[in-house]
């Protein structure tokens, strides 16, 4: 039984720091360590059959093995990947990055052999003496089986028993001279590469090898204390992730050199407590570049992971606090066109686009892209979207906003994306989806997801609750009421109040309390739309009316004044044209009479491919 473990492996791991070996060890004990609000960490006491060591730490991505009961006291496991970290006081910690449980705790049932605590001061001779003493007095577990043959160590190195090689497929002998694991910076001093998870503000000399998963644009500021600029990075290695920020001179120095998805050695930055309000990075600390910071390319970093996600289900967003930062993954069920808006705080124009993401829960969330992300987004093939660090808003339910610090990946190469794509292609695309976002003030009202026929909207009493309801439908225009559909409005940008003709060449706006030599036309169009089953009167304001008529309001105003016949033809040509309508319905009371008011929020040409696909899916669902 003792031969089943990689005897001598602990010494090789600690003394030689040879991380290429894959030892087979037994878990003796597991102890959780409190980490505040972070994910729990687990400290392990492990045995190689010869020695025990309590300085094993489990990487957080392996926590599920403990929490699921696979990794437990007495189980035997093979370590596939580990890192040795030297603490400030000289003690060494082995961080287990990847391991496989070979025999469960139930199958093993007890401690294998009589291992003794490992002491770094012991030489190999003392350990061999201990081993001989153990073999002379077999343990109850090993007395029942003949001792396994074990090759003698050669040139001062420890071998691994052949029984273990047969049982677990491990054949590489321990004791092979290990590399230094040191980085030689340009200054000539050696710095040890340490995992990100081990960084603390109390360390002065350190180097990490990390992949850049996100790089912000350069941002500037100006206030009473001066002005400056900055950019930030998100870095990841096998142990965790960290955010780094460069200011002023460091921006000029490092911004042109660092590329997203490349791997670099980072040395000597200032570490401080992280501000979680502005970052979704899972680390209690963040890094700031300074005059001593060094960044060197690493050509051998292909093994490092890419972006680390901790996904929140769309259905779980309703329990998240306002302004919380979350990682989300979903299929782009539908999307709006990019529009330009002016940010009031700095009077700067920026692009904005709403997309509607759905996951396997069938829930849909409105997600807003900004700037370059909004302009370049292509949702025509309904891609999988993974977003790290989106901000939760509570406006009208729950919605998300992508920040400048967020990471957006289209069709990421991760298992969750493949699973979601398979589900959507096989069954998800037939679902209407249930929106957790309710944009009551306009827009697409939560996305084109709540598909209804006009008959379904009426029979389900949509709009008769306390809040307005939204639905999407495909219908044809059957009648347009052109009488009084246009009015002369205040020409100022933010005012649409009807003006009064002063009969002296001026037009007065009561709201602005001003007179103007001109006006602009505004439109409120009543339309009757119908599908195969039902019809509905709807009100169309400026943009939706223009989309139906195919002409802008100013041109229509000129036609009405100069060419009544051409004006009539515009309305006639719009009849019997089909559109996809996004409609808001709400019960309103006027003069003691209650009725459902239907307002068109958005009008788009029918995507007949998508429409046909949904009809076929509905037919199959009802067969």
From Swiss-Prot:
Gene: Rpa1
Organism of this sequence: Mus musculus (Mouse)
Keywords, ordered alphabetically: Acetylation, ADP-ribosylation, DNA damage, DNA recombination, DNA repair, DNA replication, DNA-binding, Isopeptide bond, Metal-binding, Nucleus, Phosphoprotein, Ubl conjugation, Zinc, Zinc-finger
List of residues that carry Phosphoserine: 393
A biological-process GO annotation: in utero embryonic development
Modified residues (N6-acetyllysine): 172, 176, 268
Protein name (database record): Replication protein A 70 kDa DNA-binding subunit
Cross-link (Glycyl lysine isopeptide (Lys-Gly) (interchain with G-Cter in ubiquitin)): 22, 88, 172, 176, 192, 229, 253, 268, 276, 340, 419, 467, 562
Crosslink site: Glycyl lysine isopeptide (Lys-Gly) (interchain with G-Cter in SUMO): 458, 586
Job description of the protein: As part of the heterotrimeric replication protein A complex (RPA/RP-A), binds and stabilizes single-stranded DNA intermediates, that form during DNA replication or upon DNA stress. It prevents their reannealing and in parallel, recruits and activates different proteins and complexes involved in DNA metabolism. Thereby, it plays an essential role both in DNA replication and the cellular response to DNA damage. In the cellular response to DNA damage, the RPA complex controls DNA repair and DNA damage checkpoint activation.
DNA-binding region: 206-290
């Amino acid at each position: 039984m003792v031969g089943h473990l990689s005897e001598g492996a602990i010494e090789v791991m600690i003394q030689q720091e040879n991380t290429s070996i894959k030892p087979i060890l037994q878990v003796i004990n597991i102890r959780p360590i409190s980490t505040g609000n972070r994910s729990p960490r687990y400290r392990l006491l492990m045995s190689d059959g010869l020695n025990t060591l309590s300085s094993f730490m489990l990487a957080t991505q392996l926590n599920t093995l403990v929490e699921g009961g696979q990794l437990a006291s007495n189980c035997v496991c093979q370590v596939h990947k580990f890192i040795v970290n030297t603490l400030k006081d000289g003690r060494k910690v082995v961080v287990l990055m990847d391991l496989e449980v070979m025999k469960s705790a139930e199958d093993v049932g007890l401690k294998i052999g009589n291992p003794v605590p490992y002491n770094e001061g012991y030489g190999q001779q003392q350990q061999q003496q201990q081993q001989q003493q153990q073999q002379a007095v077999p343990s109850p577990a090993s007395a029942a089986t003949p001792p396994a043959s074990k090759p003698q160590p050669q040139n001062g190195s420890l071998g691994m028993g052949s029984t273990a090689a047969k049982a677990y497929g491990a054949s590489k002998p321990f004791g092979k001279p290990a590399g230094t694991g040191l980085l030689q910076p340009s200054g000539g001093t050696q710095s040890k590469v340490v995992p990100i998870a081990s960084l603390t503000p109390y360390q002065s000399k350190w180097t990490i090898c990390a992949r850049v998963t996100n790089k912000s644009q350069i941002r500037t500021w100006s206030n009473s204390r001066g002005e400056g600029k900055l950019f930030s990075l998100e870095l990841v290695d096998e142990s965790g992730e960290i955010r780094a920020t460069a200011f002023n001179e460091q921006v000029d120095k490092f911004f042109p050199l660092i590329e997203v998805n490349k791997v670099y050695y980072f040395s000597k930055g200032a570490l401080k407590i992280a501000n979680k309000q502005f970052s979704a990075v899972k680390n209690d600390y963040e890094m700031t570049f300074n005059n001593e910071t060094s960044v060197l390319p690493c050509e051998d970093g292909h093994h490092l992971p890419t972006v680390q996600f901790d996904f929140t289900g769309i259905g779980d967003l309703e329990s998240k606090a306002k302004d919380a930062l979350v990682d989300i993954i979903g299929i782009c069920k539908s999307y709006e066109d990019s529009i330009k808006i002016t940010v009031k705080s700095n009077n700067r124009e920026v692009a904005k686009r709403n997309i509607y993401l759905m996951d396997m829960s069938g829930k849909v969330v409105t997600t807003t892209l900004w700037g370059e992300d909004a302009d370049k987004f292509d949702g025509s093939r309904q891609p999988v979207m993974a977003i790290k660090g989106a901000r939760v808003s509570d406006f009208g339910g729950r919605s998300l906003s992508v920040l400048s610090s967020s990471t957006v990946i289209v069709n990421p190469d991760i298992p969750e994306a493949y699973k979601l794509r398979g589900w959507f292609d096989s069954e998800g695309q037939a679902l209407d989806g249930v929106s957790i976002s309710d944009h009551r003030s306009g827009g697409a009202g939560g996305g084109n997801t709540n598909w209804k026929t006009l008959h379904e909207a009426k029979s389900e009493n949509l709009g008769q609750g306390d809040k307005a309801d939204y639905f999407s439908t495909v219908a044809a225009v059957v009648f347009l009421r052109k009488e009084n559909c246009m009015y002369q409005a205040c020409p100022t940008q933010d005012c649409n109040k009807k003006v009064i003709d002063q009969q002296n060449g001026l037009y007065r706006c009561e709201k602005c309390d001003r007179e103007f030599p001109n006006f602009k036309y505004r439109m409120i169009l009543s339309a009757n739309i119908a599908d195969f089953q039902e019809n509905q009167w709807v009100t169309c304001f400026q943009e939706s009316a223009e989309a139906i008529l195919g002409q802008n309001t100013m041109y229509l105003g000129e036609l009405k004044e100069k060419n009544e016949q051409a004006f009539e033809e515009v309305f006639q040509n719009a009849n019997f044209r089909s559109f996809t309508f996004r409609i808001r319905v709400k019960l309103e009371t006027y003069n003691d009479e209650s009725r459902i008011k239907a307002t068109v929020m958005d009008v788009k040409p029918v995507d007949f491919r998508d429409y046909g696909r949904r009809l076929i899916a509905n037919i199959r669902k009802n067969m």
